[in-house]
Amino acid sequence: SMIDAKITSFDTDSKQENYDFGDVVLERCVSYYRGLHFTACLEFMDIPVINKFDVANTCGNKMITSMLLKKNNIPTPKTYFSFSAETALENFENIGYPLVIKPIIGSWGRSVMPVKDKDTAEAVIENRQVTDGPQDRIYYLQEMIDRPPRDIRVITVGDQAVSAMYRKSSGGFKTNIALGADPE
Protein backbone atom coordinates (compact mmCIF):
# COMPACT_ATOMS: atom_id res chain seq x y z
CA SER A 1 0.00 0.00 0.00
CA MET A 2 1.01 3.62 -0.42
CA ILE A 3 2.04 5.73 2.58
CA ASP A 4 1.86 9.50 2.22
CA ALA A 5 4.60 10.99 4.38
CA LYS A 6 2.89 14.40 4.20
CA ILE A 7 -0.06 13.15 6.25
CA THR A 8 1.73 10.67 8.51
CA SER A 9 2.97 11.71 11.93
CA PHE A 10 5.11 10.07 14.57
CA ASP A 11 6.29 10.82 18.08
CA THR A 12 9.05 9.48 20.29
CA ASP A 13 6.67 6.84 21.67
CA SER A 14 5.65 5.56 18.20
CA LYS A 15 5.85 1.79 17.79
CA GLN A 16 5.85 -0.38 14.68
CA GLU A 17 2.70 -2.17 15.79
CA ASN A 18 0.77 1.14 15.71
CA TYR A 19 1.17 1.32 11.93
CA ASP A 20 0.31 -0.95 9.03
CA PHE A 21 3.32 -0.33 6.80
CA GLY A 22 3.87 -3.95 5.75
CA ASP A 23 7.17 -5.82 6.00
CA VAL A 24 9.36 -3.19 4.34
CA VAL A 25 8.94 0.40 3.13
CA LEU A 26 10.32 1.60 -0.21
CA GLU A 27 10.86 5.31 0.44
CA ARG A 28 10.10 7.42 -2.65
CA CYS A 29 9.29 10.90 -1.31
CA VAL A 30 9.83 13.62 -3.88
CA SER A 31 11.26 15.87 -1.16
CA TYR A 32 14.76 14.77 -0.14
CA TYR A 33 14.49 16.21 3.37
CA ARG A 34 11.01 14.82 3.98
CA GLY A 35 12.08 11.38 2.77
CA LEU A 36 15.28 11.43 4.81
CA HIS A 37 13.52 12.32 8.05
CA PHE A 38 10.57 10.02 7.33
CA THR A 39 13.11 7.21 6.93
CA ALA A 40 14.72 8.15 10.25
CA CYS A 41 11.33 7.83 11.97
CA LEU A 42 10.63 4.46 10.38
CA GLU A 43 14.06 3.13 11.33
CA PHE A 44 13.53 4.44 14.88
CA MET A 45 10.58 2.03 15.03
CA ASP A 46 12.71 -0.80 13.55
CA ILE A 47 10.77 -0.79 10.27
CA PRO A 48 13.04 -1.85 7.37
CA VAL A 49 13.38 0.89 4.75
CA ILE A 50 14.87 0.92 1.26
CA ASN A 51 17.04 2.98 1.05
CA LYS A 52 18.34 3.15 4.60
CA PHE A 53 18.86 6.51 6.27
CA ASP A 54 22.66 6.33 5.99
CA VAL A 55 22.44 5.56 2.27
CA ALA A 56 19.92 8.34 1.59
CA ASN A 57 21.92 10.83 3.65
CA THR A 58 25.13 10.00 1.78
CA CYS A 59 23.69 9.79 -1.72
CA GLY A 60 21.56 12.91 -1.26
CA ASN A 61 24.67 15.02 -0.66
CA LYS A 62 26.85 15.48 -3.75
CA MET A 63 29.88 16.55 -1.71
CA ILE A 64 29.86 13.48 0.53
CA THR A 65 29.09 11.22 -2.43
CA SER A 66 31.99 12.68 -4.45
CA MET A 67 34.44 12.15 -1.60
CA LEU A 68 33.33 8.54 -1.10
CA LEU A 69 33.52 7.80 -4.82
CA LYS A 70 37.07 9.19 -4.90
CA LYS A 71 38.04 7.29 -1.74
CA ASN A 72 36.87 4.08 -3.43
CA ASN A 73 38.78 4.83 -6.67
CA ILE A 74 35.66 5.36 -8.77
CA PRO A 75 36.41 7.82 -11.59
CA THR A 76 34.50 11.09 -11.40
CA PRO A 77 35.07 14.61 -12.70
CA LYS A 78 37.60 16.62 -10.67
CA THR A 79 35.55 18.32 -7.97
CA TYR A 80 36.30 21.33 -5.77
CA PHE A 81 34.63 22.43 -2.54
CA SER A 82 34.76 25.84 -0.90
CA PHE A 83 32.90 27.37 1.99
CA SER A 84 32.75 31.07 1.19
CA ALA A 85 31.86 33.18 -1.82
CA GLU A 86 35.37 34.65 -1.90
CA THR A 87 37.05 31.25 -1.97
CA ALA A 88 34.62 29.98 -4.60
CA LEU A 89 35.48 32.92 -6.86
CA GLU A 90 39.19 32.28 -6.26
CA ASN A 91 38.65 28.65 -7.25
CA PHE A 92 36.95 29.68 -10.48
CA GLU A 93 39.89 31.93 -11.33
CA ASN A 94 42.63 29.50 -10.26
CA ILE A 95 41.11 26.41 -11.87
CA GLY A 96 39.87 28.11 -15.01
CA TYR A 97 36.73 27.93 -17.10
CA PRO A 98 34.48 26.23 -17.92
CA LEU A 99 33.34 24.64 -14.68
CA VAL A 100 29.97 23.36 -13.54
CA ILE A 101 28.46 24.61 -10.28
CA LYS A 102 25.93 22.44 -8.46
CA PRO A 103 24.07 22.62 -5.18
CA ILE A 104 25.35 19.97 -2.77
CA ILE A 105 21.76 18.87 -2.21
CA GLY A 106 19.21 18.88 -4.99
CA SER A 107 17.70 16.92 -7.81
CA TRP A 108 16.10 17.26 -11.22
CA GLY A 109 19.00 19.36 -12.48
CA ARG A 110 17.84 22.40 -10.52
CA SER A 111 20.54 25.04 -10.03
CA VAL A 112 23.11 23.01 -11.98
CA MET A 113 24.77 25.27 -14.50
CA PRO A 114 27.87 25.59 -16.63
CA VAL A 115 29.99 28.61 -15.78
CA LYS A 116 32.08 29.71 -18.74
CA ASP A 117 33.52 33.05 -17.63
CA LYS A 118 34.22 35.36 -14.69
CA ASP A 119 31.08 37.48 -15.18
CA THR A 120 28.85 34.40 -14.99
CA ALA A 121 30.75 33.09 -11.95
CA GLU A 122 30.24 36.39 -10.12
CA ALA A 123 26.53 36.47 -11.00
CA VAL A 124 25.97 32.87 -9.85
CA ILE A 125 27.83 33.44 -6.57
CA GLU A 126 25.97 36.71 -5.94
CA ASN A 127 22.64 34.97 -6.54
CA ARG A 128 23.49 32.21 -4.06
CA GLN A 129 24.44 34.77 -1.41
CA VAL A 130 20.90 36.17 -1.28
CA THR A 131 19.19 32.82 -0.71
CA ASP A 132 18.34 31.53 2.75
CA GLY A 133 19.60 27.97 2.34
CA PRO A 134 22.71 27.19 4.40
CA GLN A 135 23.70 24.61 1.78
CA ASP A 136 23.98 27.50 -0.70
CA ARG A 137 27.06 28.65 1.23
CA ILE A 138 28.89 25.49 0.23
CA TYR A 139 30.24 25.79 -3.29
CA TYR A 140 30.56 22.58 -5.30
CA LEU A 141 32.44 23.01 -8.57
CA GLN A 142 33.26 20.31 -11.11
CA GLU A 143 35.33 20.29 -14.23
CA MET A 144 33.13 20.32 -17.30
CA ILE A 145 33.47 17.06 -19.19
CA ASP A 146 33.30 17.09 -22.98
CA ARG A 147 30.77 14.31 -23.45
CA PRO A 148 27.98 13.18 -25.72
CA PRO A 149 24.61 14.81 -24.88
CA ARG A 150 23.59 11.92 -22.62
CA ASP A 151 24.34 10.26 -19.34
CA ILE A 152 23.71 6.79 -17.99
CA ARG A 153 21.47 6.02 -15.02
CA VAL A 154 22.18 2.61 -13.46
CA ILE A 155 20.07 0.97 -10.75
CA THR A 156 21.89 -1.48 -8.50
CA VAL A 157 20.83 -3.94 -5.85
CA GLY A 158 23.81 -4.68 -3.65
CA ASP A 159 26.78 -5.00 -6.00
CA GLN A 160 24.64 -6.02 -8.98
CA ALA A 161 23.49 -3.67 -11.76
CA VAL A 162 19.87 -4.63 -12.44
CA SER A 163 18.79 -1.90 -14.86
CA ALA A 164 20.28 0.95 -16.87
CA MET A 165 19.19 3.61 -19.32
CA TYR A 166 20.59 6.49 -21.30
CA ARG A 167 19.15 9.91 -20.58
CA LYS A 168 19.57 11.95 -23.76
CA SER A 169 19.51 15.72 -23.64
CA SER A 170 16.85 17.42 -25.69
CA GLY A 171 19.35 20.04 -26.82
CA GLY A 172 20.52 21.59 -23.57
CA PHE A 173 23.32 20.96 -21.10
CA LYS A 174 21.24 18.88 -18.67
CA THR A 175 20.24 15.24 -19.16
CA ASN A 176 17.47 15.11 -16.58
CA ILE A 177 14.19 13.53 -17.66
CA ALA A 178 12.19 15.99 -15.53
CA LEU A 179 13.69 18.74 -17.70
CA GLY A 180 12.85 17.07 -21.00
CA ALA A 181 15.63 14.55 -21.62
CA ASP A 182 14.57 11.37 -23.38
CA PRO A 183 15.05 7.97 -21.70
CA GLU A 184 16.38 5.17 -23.85
Predicted ranges, named:
Residues 1-55, 64:
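ATP-binding N-terminal substructure of ATP-dependent carboxylate-amine bond-forming enzymes
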Residues 18, 43-46, 51, 56-140, ...:
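Active-site nucleotide/adenylate-binding loops and adjacent lid/helix of ATP-dependent enzymes
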Residues 28, 82, 167:
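Conserved residues at the C-terminal ends of beta-strands
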Residues 33, 57, 87, 162, ...:
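Surface-exposed, flexible loop/turn segments at secondary-structure boundaries
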Residues 36-39, 59-61, 94, 166-171:
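Short hydrophobic/aromatic-rich motifs at helix boundaries and adjacent loops
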Residues 113-184:
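Phosphate-binding site of ATP-dependent enzymes
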